[in-house]
């Protein structure tokens, strides 16, 4: 990254300005001297070039006073290896661990695959007929004496349920926020919303409490949200109907029939032209033209053309959170929204699994009502004509598939069952071997014709929901093909020009500046992203420059009034990176992935335009908020607490890699840098930076209490299980 010697005028967004050679930190109330200390002590890259000690590539430049002897926090495996395996897992963790993954590969050395998380359950569960009813007036249990659950509430509380948590002030965070707890007597903080009342016969009856004032305050802010503040909830009846193929997909069926017929005709047509040896036979040429006209006549326009779909907007003030498997769960997305993230995506869902009605896959579509609110955009934003911010929302779905019918049918089902989606994004960047071998994810980069068919079909059946796509530079380092692919996605390929059906109609393209082969071994190539951004700008603004006028796109097939938005993705770790990419790469917005997992307040930094040196106390407060959001999502009963703990530990396996700004010798920080052994400014900061998973468990116990005796957690990499000596 080039040093900045003075404040440069912003060509795109005056709001995001690069620093004038000085490190900037937040002036937090807890540490009023932080900003002054960072400005006076930290060395910028400009000062390095003026004679200060050089910054070592790949090593986090920690100040000498915070370094410790290697033996104190040594790790048997290089930190970079740990990070690479974890970063790959963030893209498709549970697909990576499916059966069929090849074993014994050298690059998998040190990884814990097929991890076992144990279980967190009551010794004996409470019957659902008793869980929410007053002690002496329960609902009738349809299993009667054969029921395997406990029917006596007091016996359950005394003998089968672990003691209540003492965290959160002893008050259930769900009840505190909503005035009611949907987990009843099974809640691990039930004593905060349970009491005894005297009955007419002199007995003491246990009852659950509700707070009407809290319930009024907690009413959903989005009209179509559930009582719990969630959107895109698919009922069990709908999922069963999908699984049993009782839910029809008429638009997909019609499109796929046309696609099959057209593909065969085109194949025959193109094959015949090759045999003509230069096309000397005019009769054959005329016949080919007639066939093309027949194909055009047979094409039935979809009910919603790309130009008629809901308009969207991406801009410098709308940073997006990348789709993240495992890490991109609902509690984490809520946390990012709280810190200024404007767009979120579901975890990657497999199209075939959605078609089969798998509950786990449909559960990925759930979103919090905060994600269903319109994004905050600038009053001077250059929005496309027809864009209505009040109808926009923040949450989109991402799917993957290896066959056109997988993606197309899944899209129609999503549009029908989960209509509260900003976009449906097709994943063409997942590098995981299992996904790649099946022909999905980044494998589609080498099959542009198939990819175009998938996107065109998705557009034909998604109704008002726009279609977007996320790609990589290519599958191999030495042969990037994103420029050719982008041109095809914006203008349409040769087949579409023969049929005169225009481009596939994607509303936005996101490019991750790495190849599939590269993974995270090198930094993202933002110069290539800039090249692609310039190409899209030319295609958006100067359609007349397209030399092949036959391929000039049909305006009816163009989304967003003819503009295809372009987002860059890769290694954004601070507002400095974000501003640099906006101003120098020419992207409309930046999608943040690993940077947000490691420090969710990166969105806050982007909004403020300065570094924020969050104290250990502030960072721990984020962990507490995550715990509350986790209990709200997965439950405050024993099982929910265990699930929250598991996903919190997965998140902490990334957050420990954050080195506080105040400890760095040079700025800006680089996400690829790996730190030597270091200690924090206090014990809590040191604990938050520990690479030992047992310390991560200690952090979860601050809010979730001691782990269940049957709970297990294996870190993604064996080195994180290493116990430091001394």
Curated annotation (Swiss-Prot):
Its cofactor is FMN. The active site is at residue 430. FMN binds at residues 323-325, 398, 470, 512, 569-571, 593-594. Its main location: cytoplasm. Keywords: Cytoplasm, Flavoprotein, FMN, Metal-binding, mRNA processing, NAD, NADP, Nucleus, Oxidoreductase, Repeat, tRNA processing, Zinc, Zinc-finger. It is found in: Cytoplasm; Nucleus. It comes from the Eukaryota. It is an enzyme of class 1 (oxidoreductase). CDD domains: DUS_like_FMN. One of its GO terms (molecular function) is tRNA-dihydrouridine47 synthase activity. One of its GO terms (cellular component) is cytoplasm. It catalyses: 5,6-dihydrouridine(47) in tRNA + NAD(+) = uridine(47) in tRNA + NADH + H(+); 5,6-dihydrouridine(47) in tRNA + NADP(+) = uridine(47) in tRNA + NADPH + H(+); a 5,6-dihydrouridine in mRNA + NAD(+) = a uridine in mRNA + NADH + H(+); a 5,6-dihydrouridine in mRNA + NADP(+) = a uridine in mRNA + NADPH + H(+). Signal peptide: none annotated. GO terms for biological process: mRNA processing. Residues 24-56, 68-124 are annotated as: Disordered. SUPFAM superfamilies: FMN-linked oxidoreductases. Residues 28-38, 94-103, 113-124 have a biased composition (Basic and acidic residues). Belongs to the Dus family. Dus3 subfamily. Catalyzes the synthesis of dihydrouridine, a modified base found in the D-loop of most tRNAs. Specifically modifies U47 in cytoplasmic tRNAs. Catalyzes the synthesis of dihydrouridine in some mRNAs, thereby affecting their translation. This is tRNA-dihydrouridine(47) synthase [NAD(P)(+)]. It comes from Neosartorya fischeri (strain ATCC 1020 / DSM 3700 / CBS 544.65 / FGSC A1164 / JCM 1740 / NRRL 181 / WB 181) (Aspergillus fischerianus). The gene is dus3.
């Amino acid at each position: 990254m080039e040093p900045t010697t003075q404040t440069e005028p912003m060509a795109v967004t005056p709001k995001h300005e690069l620093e004038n050679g000085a490190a900037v930190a937040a002036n937090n109330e807890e540490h009023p001297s932080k900003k002054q200390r960072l400005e006076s002590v930290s060395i910028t890259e400009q000062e390095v070039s003026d004679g200060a000690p050089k910054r070592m590539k790949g090593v986090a430049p920690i100040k000498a006073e915070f370094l410790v002897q290697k033996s104190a926090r040594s790790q048997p495996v290089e930190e970079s290896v740990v990070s690479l395996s974890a970063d790959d897992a963030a893209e498709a963790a549970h697909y990576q661990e499916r059966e069929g993954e090849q074993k014994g590969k050298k690059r998998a050395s040190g990884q814990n695959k097929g991890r076992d998380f144990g279980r967190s359950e009551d010794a004996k569960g409470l019957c659902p007929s008793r869980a929410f009813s007053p002690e002496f007036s329960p609902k009738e249990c349809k299993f009667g004496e054969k029921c395997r659950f406990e029917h006596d509430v007091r016996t359950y509380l005394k003998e089968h349920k672990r003691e209540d948590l003492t965290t959160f002030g002893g008050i259930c965070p769900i009840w505190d926020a909503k005035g009611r707890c949907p987990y009843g007597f099974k809640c691990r903080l039930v004593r905060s919303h349970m009491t005894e009342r005297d009955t007419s016969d002199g007995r003491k009856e246990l009852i659950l409490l509700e707070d009407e004032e809290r319930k009024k305050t907690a009413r959903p802010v989005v009209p179509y949200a559930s009582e719990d503040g969630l959107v895109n909830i698919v009922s069990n009846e709908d999922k069963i109907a999908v699984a049993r193929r009782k839910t029809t997909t008429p638009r997909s069926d019609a499109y796929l029939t046309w696609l099959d017929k057209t593909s065969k005709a085109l194949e025959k047509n193109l094959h015949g032209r090759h045999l003509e040896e230069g096309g000397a036979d005019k009769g054959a040429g005329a016949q080919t033209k007639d066939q093309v006209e027949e194909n055009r006549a047979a094409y039935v326009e979809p009910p919603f053309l790309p130009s008629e779909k809901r308009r969207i907007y991406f801009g410098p003030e709308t940073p997006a959170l990348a789709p993240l498997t495992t890490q991109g769960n609902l509690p984490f997305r809520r946390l990012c929204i709280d810190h200024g993230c404007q767009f979120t995506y579901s975890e990657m869902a497999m199209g075939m699994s959605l078609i089969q009605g798998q509950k786990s896959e449909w559960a990925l579509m759930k979103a919090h009502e905060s994600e269903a609110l319109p994004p905050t955009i600038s009053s001077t934003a250059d929005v496309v004509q027809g864009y209505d911010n009040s109808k926009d929302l923040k949450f989109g779905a991402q799917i993957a598939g290896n066959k056109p019918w997988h993606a197309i049918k899944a899209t129609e089902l999503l549009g029908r069952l989960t209509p509260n989606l900003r976009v449906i994004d097709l994943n063409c960047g997942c590098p995981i071997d299992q996904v790649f071998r099946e022909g999905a994810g980044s494998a589609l980069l080498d099959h542009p014709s198939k990819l175009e068919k998938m996107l065109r079909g998705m557009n034909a059946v998604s109704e008002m929901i726009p279609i977007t796509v996320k790609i990589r530079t290519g599958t191999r380092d030495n042969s990037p093909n994103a420029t050719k692919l982008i041109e095809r996605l914006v203008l349409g390929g040769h087949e579409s020009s023969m049929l005169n059906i225009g481009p596939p109609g994607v509303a936005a393209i996101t490019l991750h500046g790495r190849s599939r082969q590269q993974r995270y071994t090198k930094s993202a190539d933002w110069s290539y992203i800039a090249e692609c951004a310039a190409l899209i700008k030319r295609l958006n603004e100067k359609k007349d420059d397209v030399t092949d006028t036959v391929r000039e796109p049909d305006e009816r097939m163009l989304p967003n009034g003819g503009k295809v938005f372009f987002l860059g993705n890769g290694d954004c770790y601070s507002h400095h990176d974000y501003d640099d990419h906006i101003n120098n790469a020419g992207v409309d917005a930046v999608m943040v992935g690993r940077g947000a997992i490691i420090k969710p307040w990166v969105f806050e930094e982007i909004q403020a335009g300065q570094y924020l040196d969050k104290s250990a106390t502030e960072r721990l407060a984020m962990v507490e908020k995550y715990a509350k959001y986790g209990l709200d999502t997965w439950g405050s009963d024993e099982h929910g607490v265990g699930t929250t703990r598991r996903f919190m530990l997965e998140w902490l396996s990334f957050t420990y890699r954050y080195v506080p700004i105040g400890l760095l010798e040079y700025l800006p920080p680089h996400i690829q840098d790996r730190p030597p052994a270091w200690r924090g400014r206090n014990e809590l900061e040191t604990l938050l930076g520990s690479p030992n998973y047992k310390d991560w468990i200690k952090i979860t116990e601050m809010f979730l209490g001691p782990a269940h005796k049957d709970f297990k957690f294996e870190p993604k990499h064996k080195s994180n299980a290493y116990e430091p000596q001394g």
